[in-house]
Swiss-Prot record, chain A:
The gene is RAB3A. Its cofactor is Mg(2+). This is Ras-related protein Rab-3A. It comes from Bos taurus (Bovine). The keyword Ribosomal protein does not apply. Belongs to the small GTPase superfamily. Rab family.
Length: 220, 611
């Protein structure tokens, strides 16, 4: 089984330094909700219907271009099984953002969301950015968790919400990019609002704005 | 969906899979650490550039970034919230979507925080203050796994480790780990050891799924060894406290550096936006300093054919702000005196470009050996940021009879790119000794800046008298000529580490009868580019005397406690040829000096290169 897993993961994280910064993202959720598939869809644009249970932890890297910056994402895929919990929670502290996933065809996985959220609160930093993702939305016929319930829970927990499908490649890219953006926002916030309002900022006409990075969404 | 796999086979595959991941992660983290080091080095340079310009001209009210003078009404500058320095409007960068701005350096600082992820570590520290900055879970896992393994190898383990052959099929990387005796402990130990790093798991740790509960724990508890967990707890604590060497092994990307003080950390840089240390008495420890030996640097020395190597280590101690060069040994040195097969080597260092005697450190002299062992640490008290502009020169010399010195070779290490955070670069290394570079400043006079002077020969009569003056009979002070010299100012002087000097000029006119007329300017405090505008007037000299005289102008940095003023550089004017070991006269200066003598009562401006 391990060899199957190994084969699924490529090994060219590469020594490429051609990026501006690195974000670490963790995907969590019950076993078999589609975390690994989701990551493979995003990183490799591939999908396998066969289920290969993830051993402990694994990761992939992907460099994206977002807001005029090259951002290297190290995306950690975790095993949902409790027996790996000690290992997986060890990775919570290093993550800037989380994708918390459930399976819209699996009630139990949805019920566990609250507990996963508690895990994040316990093991991660206070400003952890979380996106709630209801996966397998291609399986409309077998849906047991309505979009509305998903959205309500997300609101309740203060997370943003997406329904997605790793199989049909729905909202996969969007999920990651949105997560990157909210992390960027958090970053700007922590860097710039830490300073008290600047007093003597006389904005002369010669203000050197061209040095500021020219993008709309985040000041990073 | 949870599959029921037999525990034994699962453990082995799990172990392999997880270690694979840990190693892959380590590679990513190593790359990342390297990138971050590069970034921080660049920021350091930027800061240094800002700081260096302070030395160009010291001004009360100038922009901290570009040194532009700030006005009282217009362009008064404003204080940057980040660093509290006053900067001009050009040196501000406005942040997107805000009216807030930062100075160029703080802006870069912010960029670096983004790029290094330090913003995150700072935020995270609010919740986990003890968490190592770049310490990753993977590094910790590897570390704790290893610690656990070590522990098991010391204390006879229960149950005994499995046989080595179990990891036989693993990839080479895993074999490497296989040398740790505990390697074959199942991955459960890995989990257990991680568990000990964490606080008690919250209630939410309880199973959320239908997955089997702690399958890996079950057999243990049945075996009736509940103390296992605490045992491994102790193991880790002991190891940590004892600081055993395995922590230092380059296992994780960050963890090995933990024990040393990481040098290029963000906060260290930001806490010293402007260089603020000066050389102090502390710099004398651990090394011999020869004062007043500046001239020997320009003086004569022999050169042997350079052979051999020197072993030393370079470290920076953040706590004491000192650069430490640990000189260990040399081998295969050339004989200082080839015919007599004699060699009494010693090692000398400078932090170039400073070649003043205060910047010199020497080891003791070893007698009659070409394989000397020194084991001496030479120290410089210097801000880390300052080092970006410096090169470490380590040279080996033979001390012969009558203090005759023979150059045996040197190594020049540019410190700008030196990674003081890296353990590798802190360790001892052999460096091949090299001959002096062609244009080496040690064999040629050093350029220690320029001195601007204005000179005039004042004669009561016209130039005719000068031409008629008989050669060689110049002992006629009655002619009452005067040599007027205005020392205007100097620039590019070897400044102190705070970028300033308390400098003064000495003028010494040596007449043909070796009589010396000496004058001294007042001290100009806290200036890197002093403008003394001070007049030296040498009275009662005749043109013929002057043509056989020499005028030496030397610049000094006044010692704070008045012991030894530091020689900054000097220049010589005069037709007399160079004295051995003395300052040199450049041909251009010669021409200018001739002009002074041949055009009495007229001012001649000249720029003298200081050596
Ligand atoms: N129909 C459908 N199946 C999916 C989707 N994502 C994953 N799966 C399947 O669900 C099973 C578990 O997926 P996996 O990614 O291994 O789940 P993980 O345990 O959370 O990593 C596999 O058989 C996948 O093929 C999806 O979006 N749609
Ligand atoms: Mg998986
Ligand atoms: Zn400025
Ligand atoms: Zn500033």
């Amino acid at each position: 089984m391990a060899s199957a897993t190994d084969a699924r993961y490529g090994q060219k994280e590469s020594s490429d330094q051609n990026f501006d910064y690195m974000f670490k993202i963790l995907i969590i959720g019950n076993s078999s909700v589609g975390k690994t598939s989701f990551l493979f869809r995003y990183a490799d644009d591939s999908f396998t219907p066969a289920f290969v249970s993830t051993v402990g932890i694994d990761f992939k890297v992907k460099t994206i271009y977002r807001n005029d910056k090259r951002i290297k994402l190290q995306i950690w895929d975790t095993a949902g099984q409790e027996r790996y919990r000690t290992i997986t929670t060890a990775y919570y502290r290093g993550a800037m953002g989380f994708i918390l996933m459930y399976d819209i065809t699996n009630e139990e996985s949805f019920n566990a969301v609250q507990d996963w959220s508690t895990q994040i609160k316990t093991y991660s930093w206070d400003n952890a950015q979380v996106l709630l993702v209801g996966n397998k939305c291609d399986m409309e016929d077998e849906r047991v968790v309505s979009s509305e319930r998903g959205r309500q829970l997300a609101d309740h927990l203060g997370f943003e919400f997406f329904e997605a499908s790793a199989k049909d490649n729905i909202n996969v890219k969007q999920t990651f990019e949105r997560l990157v953006d909210v992390i960027c926002e958090k970053m700007s916030e922590s860097l710039d609002t830490a300073d008290p309002a600047v007093t003597g900022a006389k904005q002369g006409p010669q203000l050197t704005d061209q040095q500021a990075p020219p993008h709309q969404d985040c000041a990073c | 969906m949870a599959q029921q796999v037999s525990l034994g086979s699962l453990q082995e595959s799990e172990r392999e899979a997880i270690l694979q991941v840990l190693y892959r992660d380590r590679e990513v983290q190593n790359t990342e650490a390297e990138r971050i080091r590069n970034l921080k080095t660049r920021l350091q340079h930027l800061r240094w550039k800002g700081a260096k310009s302070v030395s160009q001209e010291y001004k009360e009210k100038s922009c901290a970034r570009c040194q532009q003078t700030l006005g009282l009404l217009l362009n008064r500058g404003a204080v940057c919230q980040g660093c509290s320095h006053r900067v001009c409007s050009e040196c501000r960068v406005f942040l997107r979507r805000t009216r807030a701005w930062k100075c160029t350096v703080c802006f870069e600082d912010r960029n670096v925080k983004i790029k290094t992820g330090d913003w995150f570590f700072e935020e995270r520290a609010k919740k986990f203050p003890t968490e190592g900055k770049h310490e990753t879970a993977g590094a910790k896992l590897l570390q704790s796994y290893q610690k656990l393994s070590n522990k098991i190898s010391v204390v006879p383990p229960t149950p005994p480790p499995l046989s080595e052959s179990q990891c036989g099929g693993g990839p080479a990387r895993l074999q490497e780990l296989g040398q740790f005796k505990g390697f074959n402990k199942s991955v459960e130990n890995l989990f257990l050891s991680v568990t000990t790093h964490m606080k008690k798991l919250s209630k939410s740790q309880n199973d959320m799924t239908s997955d089997k509960q702690h399958p890996e724990m079950v057999p243990r508890q049945r075996e009736g060894r509940p103390e296992r967990r605490s045992q491994s707890d102790t193991a880790i604590n002991v190891t940590t406290r004892a600081g055993t060497p395995d922590i230092l092994k380059p296992l994780g990307p960050e963890s090995p550096r933990r024990p040393t003080s990481p040098v290029l950390k963000q906060e260290d840089i930001s806490s010293s936006p402007v260089l603020n240390t000066s050389f102090s008495g502390g710099l004398r420890q651990g090394s011999l300093i020869s004062i007043n030996s500046t001239c020997t640097e320009m003086g004569n020395f022999d050169k042997a054919d350079v052979t051999g190597e020197i072993e030393f280590a370079i470290r920076y101690c953040l706590r004491t702000h000192s650069l430490e060069i640990c000189i260990r040994a040399c081998k295969n040195l050339a004989f200082g005196e080839e015919r007599k097969k004699k060699c009494n080597p010693y090692v000398k260092t400078y932090l170039l470009p400073d070649r003043s005697s205060q910047g010199k450190r020497k080891t003791g002299v070893q007698k009659n050996t070409v394989e000397p062992t020194f084991q001496e640490t030479l120290k410089y008290q210097v801000e880390l940021a300052q080092l970006a502009s410096q090169q470490l020169q380590v040279s080996v010399w033979h001390l012969g009879v009558l203090t005759r010195r023979v150059f045996l070779g040197e190594v020049i290490v540019p410190l700008a790119t030196w990674d003081f955070e890296d353990r590798e670069s802190q360790s001892f290394r052999w460096y091949p000794l090299r001959a002096k570079a062609e244009k080496s400043e040690d064999s040629l006079p050093t350029n220690n800046g320029e001195l601007a002077v204005r000179a005039k020969l004042v004669l009561p009569a016209g130039p005719r008298e000068l031409q008629e003056a008989p050669e060689g009979t110049g002992d006629e002070p009655s002619q009452n000529g005067q040599l007027c010299l205005v020392v205007l100012g100097a620039k590019n002087l070897p400044v102190r580490s705070d970028g300033t000097l308390n400098s003064f000029v000495k003028g010494c006119l040596t007449l043909p009868d070796q009589q010396r007329l000496r004058l001294k300017s007042p001290v100009l405090k806290k200036q890197a580019c002093p403008q003394w505008k001070h007049s030296f007037i040498f009275k009662g000299v005749t043109p013929s005397q002057l043509r056989q005289s020499s005028l030496e102008l030397t610049i000094w940095d006044q010692a704070t406690f008045g012991v030894n003023d530091r020689f900054l550089g000097g220049a010589r004017l005069g037709l007399k040829e160079d004295l051995p070991g003395g300052a040199h006269t450049s041909s251009q200066a010669k021409l200018q000096w001739q002009k002074v003598l041949s055009s009495p009562n007229l001012w001649t401006d000249m720029t003298l290169i200081l050596h």
